């Protein structure tokens, strides 16, 4: 299975990403890493995801969900 998960560096998205990876899903994580709260915290979460034992199933796309062209490319590609 494959999922596109928005906000993958946020609190809920981070935990969902790890859970989906544990379930052997391919996760396309979308996040713009805005400064709503600590960018360092978000980057640390991404680092932890990339260290996950099934990290080969994780694809990160840095973009905003309000960027239609970028999201369209992601949906077409994956």
Language model regions located:
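N-terminal Rossmann-like NAD(P)+-binding domain of SDR-like oxidoreductases, especially those catalyzing
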Residues: 1-78
């Amino acid at each position: 299975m494959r999922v596109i998960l928005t906000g993958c560096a946020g609190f809920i998205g981070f935990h969902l990403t790890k859970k989906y990876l544990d379930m052997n899903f391919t996760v396309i994580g979308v996040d713009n890493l805005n400064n709503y709260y600590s960018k360092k915290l978000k980057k640390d979460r991404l680092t932890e995801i990339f260290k996950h034992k099934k990290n080969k199933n994780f694809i990160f796309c840095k973009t905003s969900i309000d960027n239609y062209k970028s999201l369209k490319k992601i949906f077409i590609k994956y």
